[in-house]
Amino acid sequence: MKSMDKISTGIAYGTSAGSAGYWFLQWLDQVSPSQWAAIGVLGSLVLGFLTYLTNLYFKIREDRRKAARGE
């Protein structure tokens, strides 16, 4: 049989997750569809920019390795 501390820990985590889920859904209801569209556009632009910076970083590292090897 499970010990009481494991049962109470599970109940506490379940209650916390349920409460967080409830408040998250309440927050989602306050955002209008046009605001979600703006969030989506801005999010995709930020993600594209981060992808560009990551690619640039690894290209610079590759170029430095090639220069160090004399290629």
From Swiss-Prot:
It is found in: Host cell inner membrane. Changing residue 1 to L: No effect on lysis activity. InterPro entries: Lysis_S. It is a multi-pass membrane protein. Residues 28-37 are periplasmic. GO terms for molecular function: identical protein binding; pore-forming activity. It comes from Enterobacteria phage P21 (Bacteriophage 21). The N-terminal transmembrane domain seems to be externalized during the pinhole formation. The chain crosses the membrane at residues 7-27, 38-58. Residues 1-6, 59-71 are cytoplasmic. Its main location: host cell. GO terms for cellular component: host cell plasma membrane; membrane. Keywords: Cytolysis, Host cell inner membrane, Host cell lysis by virus, Host cell membrane, Host membrane, Membrane, Transmembrane, Transmembrane helix, Viral release from host cell. One of its GO terms (biological process) is viral release from host cell by cytolysis. This is Antiholin. The gene is S.
